[in-house]
Amino acid sequence: MSAGASGGSISEILTAIPIDDIPAVEVGNGCYRRDLPSGADVRVWVVDILPGCEWPNVDQHDKAGEELLVVSGELIEGEQRFEAGTYVYFLPGSSHRPRSEKGVRLFGFNVSAARTYS
């Protein structure tokens, strides 16, 4: 359905926010997360990891796994390096601890995010 068909304006059917206007939550030294507006059962987020920093704990995934896009910089997972423009899918039940030597911005989402996040 388009905004015109409903008789309302486009602003009534969407939310548009500059990413950097969303307050960042520091989850560890040099690691920041922004939670974006999203529908039920989907958690959408942006993570920034500053140069030389590592996620503060091991990130464990449930039965849906985790999907992310490296927006800028370089993500390091184990011995693998992922540059901007790389899509990464972590399988259900997987775990990882991301880090970056150059700094990185990630856009990701978790489907069916029934657990609480801190």
Residue map of PLM features:
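A short, N-terminal "cap"/entry segment at the start of jelly-roll beta-barrel domains
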Residues: 1-45
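Conserved short histidine dyad/triad with adjacent acidic residue
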Residues: 28-33, 38-62, 76, 80-81, ...
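Preference for bulky hydrophobic residues occupying beta-strand positions
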Residues: 47, 88, 108-109
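Alpha/beta-hydrolase fold active-site loops
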Residues: 65
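Structured binding elements
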Residues: 68
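Glycine-centered positions in the ABC transporter ATPase nucleotide-binding domain
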Residues: 72-73
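Ligand-binding loop in jelly-roll beta-barrel domains
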Residues: 81, 92-117
